[in-house]
Amino acid sequence: MSDNKGTKLDPKECCSAWLSLEAECSDSSLDGDLEKLFDEGTDSDISDLIDDGDAVQGNSRELFCQQESEESEQQTQLLKRKYISPQAVLQLSPQLESISLSPQHKPKRRLFEQDSGLECSVNEAEDLSETQVEEVPANPPTTAQGTKGLGIVKDLLKHSNVKAVLMAKFKEAFGVGFAELTRQYKSNKTCCRDWVIAVYAVNDDLIESSKQLLLQHCAYIWLHYMPPMCLYLLCFNVGKSRETVCRLLSTLLQVSEVQLLSEPPKLRSVCAALFWYKGSMNPNVYAHGAYPEWILTQTLINHQSANATQFDLSTMIQFAYDHEYFDEATIAYQYAKLAETDANARAFLQSNSQARLVKECATMVRHYMRGEMKEMSMSTWIHRKLLTVESNGQWSDIVRFIRYQDINFIEFLTVFKAFLQNKPKQNCLLFHGPPDTGKSMFTMSLISVLKGKVLSFANCKSTFWLQPIADTKLALIDDVTHVCWEYIDQYLRNGLDGNYVCLDMKHRAPCQMKFPPLMLTSNIDITKDQKYKYLHSRVKSFAFNNKFPLDANHKPQFELTDQSWKSFFKRLWTQLDLSDQEDEGEDGNSQRTFQCTARDFNGPV
């Protein structure tokens, strides 16, 4: 092999064509021409390339710090927008935006300082435009009036008590307090026909239009506009709640409910009635329709005003007696409902002693009814109670039910006739048997039609538990147990014998009386227990051994109603020896049975 490991080249041979290896000297010499050298040394082919002026040393370090600060602030704002703004969360996931572990609070007015960077300002404009697009509703743009109303609402909401501000403005405008003309309804659901409404800052054109639009809703309109307040007295055709009234006026007047005060007027205040009456004569007040009755009552003078109606207790007693109201609450409520048409009821409501009057009325009605009941025979009582039952039923349902219980109907009718006549040792009926055989249903239906009383042995610890039998013609003790049988065997033998007993009465002296016919229901047959052998002759018993039948719809197959008993008594009136008493009951049907008022009903009108 050759020893040459490479090629030896002369670099001068390769690049001698374009590389100058030695400097070339110019033939022209400047040694003798120094002046020309100095003249050409300062000249240049390019003008003003170098500024030969004096340089001013600036504060370069301050400029550098300022640039670094702006750059750092810009980066900080970008990080805040990336990790804090909701736009970043929205970009990650639309559903993630609705998830929040902390409660939502209103943002502070200036949480972050406004930056001046170009890119940040562009991002802010994008976020603002997107938010505005989401919040723009489908309604047309608001008018100048809507903008003004929104500003008024915002001004009101700045106050801690908006209602107090409106009431102060009302008193400043009309010279009278809003509470002096109205009474307060705490519930927004309570209905009333008459409403007083004060509206703040309403457009004049809308007020004029409301005069015509409210005619279809109201029987009487009273309107007075004293800027910035507008006062309405509206008597609607039907009762309306506060919610309905505010919704109606908000629609008609284009105002927010914050700008409204609504309460019903005072109906018994003479001063309030005079305010409305005299105000209607003001030429600046718009009034349409007839005056409400409560304004006329308080302001106009008529032939009845000379003698103010005084309350007559006897009229109230007659009302309760005719309708058979014994309970104090029922008497008070039903009589107060007559105040719109009855002068005596109106005087009752104006009285400061309503509770005492109601108590006295209920007491007198019970006295009258007790005296009338004692005067009546059983036949008259039954006839009177059957007259109050409307329509007729099937008497055969009662007969079929008695036969269904394997009871001889003729035997039952004989015992039932002696029971109604309250004969000694025959005035107590016992219906015994297993549960669900119809014992309580049968006896309760008879108590219902004859308006009897039910005694409860649960009150036996009280000495007055037998007091209700003093005010009835028929009594019932339901579900008699061994404890009750022992009590009857020890203490009530004389009563079952038909003799007089001494009955303890609450708040009254003990009275002497006989027991009325008494019915008992029990699961115990005392006729087979010698423990109660002294009651065997005093109690007439019937066994109900068959379960009460029901149809496919779980309704009773035997209709034991008031109508059924009415038909039963009318059908068997003669068999029960009630015929003579029926004739007595028919006498004087056209005449009032009892008159407890001082006025002569037969005199001139």
Swiss-Prot record:
One annotated Gene Ontology cellular component of this protein: host cell nucleus
Residues covered by the SF3 helicase domain: 407-557
Name of the featured protein: Replication protein E1
Subcellular location: Host nucleus
Keywords, sorted A to Z: ATP-binding, DNA replication, DNA-binding, Early protein, Helicase, Host nucleus, Hydrolase, Isomerase, Isopeptide bond, Nucleotide-binding, Phosphoprotein, Ubl conjugation
Catalytic reaction equation(s): Couples ATP hydrolysis with the unwinding of duplex DNA by translocating in the 3'-5' direction; ATP + H2O = ADP + phosphate + H(+)
Region (DNA-binding region): 145-308
Role played: ATP-dependent DNA 3'-5' helicase required for initiation of viral DNA replication. It forms a complex with the viral E2 protein. The E1-E2 complex binds to the replication origin which contains binding sites for both proteins. During the initial step, a dimer of E1 interacts with a dimer of protein E2 leading to a complex that binds the viral origin of replication with high specificity. Then, a second dimer of E1 displaces the E2 dimer in an ATP-dependent manner to form the E1 tetramer.
Residues that hold ATP according to the record: G433, P434, P435, D436, T437, G438, K439, S440
UniProt modification remark: Phosphorylated. Sumoylated.
Organism phylogeny: Viruses, Monodnaviria, Shotokuvirae, Cossaviricota, Papovaviricetes
Cross-link (Glycyl lysine isopeptide (Lys-Gly) (interchain with G-Cter in SUMO)): K514
Subunit-level organization: Can form hexamers. Interacts with E2 protein; this interaction increases E1 DNA binding specificity. Interacts with host DNA polymerase subunit POLA2. Interacts with host single stranded DNA-binding protein RPA1. Interacts with host TOP1; this interaction stimulates the enzymatic activity of TOP1.
Single GO molecular function: ATP binding
InterPro entries: Helicase_SF3_DNA-vir, P-loop_NTPase, PPV_DNA_helicase_E1_C, PPV_DNA_helicase_E1_N, PPV_E1_DBD, PPV_E1_DBD_sf, Rep_E1_papillomaV, Znf_lg_T-Ag_D1_dom_sf
Record PTM Phosphoserine, positions in chain: S85, S93
EC number: 5.6.2.4
Family to which the UniProt record says this protein belongs: Belongs to the papillomaviridae E1 protein family.
One of the GO BP terms on file: DNA replication
Native source organism of the sequence: Human papillomavirus 9
Positions of short motif Nuclear export signal: 92-101
Residue ranges of the motif Nuclear localization signal: 80-82
Main location: host cell
